[in-house]
Regions:
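Basic, helix-initiating cap at the start of DNA-binding domains
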Residues: 1-29, 33-45, 58-62
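Hydrophobic alpha-helical connector segments
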Residues: 63, 76-111, 161-168, 192
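Hydrophobic/aromatic-rich alpha-helical bundle segments in the mid-to-C-terminal region
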Residues: 128-132, 136, 150-202
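Solvent-exposed, amphipathic alpha-helical segments
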Residues: 17, 21-29, 75, 79, ...
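Key DNA-contact positions within bacterial/archaeal DNA-binding proteins
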Residues: 48
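Alpha-helical DNA-contacting segments of helix-turn-helix folds
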Residues: 54, 62-68
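Amphipathic alpha-helical segments used for helix-helix packing
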Residues: 92, 105-129, 177
Length: 204
């Protein structure tokens, strides 16, 4: 008789599956409409498995938000950098602005979800450290992306990378929220123009 050995999934794999499921639930239901039980069911684990990896729903949201940001925003910046480094008739800032607009402003709900979570944080001071850590991590990722960008395209002499990353971060978030709420008031050409102005202040 053959005995089948059940392989226990790695903790990192379980965590990744939970974060992916959480991202899908939050995107569909919003922050208030999502529960830990729903995330667990979607991931195919028990609630206990979720709580062994995360303290609760706020921490789940922060992890899912960070996964979105790393993929969509930092990834979009990498794509934009690639576009700028490729042969083109467009000036570098315009090429990057076009790529950023295409990748970032796709109607994703996450910037709006972050606003929903921020409203919860305003009412629950205990969550402020979690929110601050999330935003600081995002800024650090953009600083690192800008530092890598400087190896491929020239940056303005004396540029403060943290200030530039914060400006870019604020621009991406604000434009995404406005575009999501009223696309007709924030047309693509205007978005590209705004990104171009910001990037011209960053690039040499």
């Amino acid at each position: 008789m053959t005995t089948t050995t059940r392989v226990r999934p790695l903790r990192s794999d379980v965590r990744e599956q939970i974060v992916t499921a959480a991202g899908a639930e939050f995107a569909e239901r919003g922050y208030a409409g999502t529960s830990v039980a729903q995330v667990a069911a979607r991931a195919g684990f028990t609630k206990g498995a979720v709580y062994s990896n995360f303290e609760g729903k706020p921490e789940l949201f922060a992890a899912a938000m960070q996964a979105y940001f790393a993929g969509a925003v930092v990834g979009a910046f990498a794509d934009a950098l690639g576009a700028a480094a490729s042969p083109s008739d467009q000036p570098t800032a315009q090429a990057m602005a076009h790529a950023l607009a295409e990748n970032v402003l796709l109607g994703e709900r996450w910037p709006t979800l972050l606003g929903e979570f921020r409203a919860v944080v305003a009412q629950e001071p205990a969550l402020r450290d979690l929110y601050a850590e999330l935003r600081l991590t995002q800024r650090t990722q953009l600083v690192d992306a800008l530092r890598r960008a400087g190896e491929q395209v020239p940056l303005r002499v004396g540029l403060d990378l943290e200030v530039a990353a914060t400006l870019l971060h604020t621009c991406v978030h604000g434009l995404s929220v406005e575009r999501s709420a009223a696309p007709e008031a924030m047309p693509t050409a205007l978005v590209e123009g705004l990104f171009t102005q910001v990037l011209e202040g960053i690039l040499a």
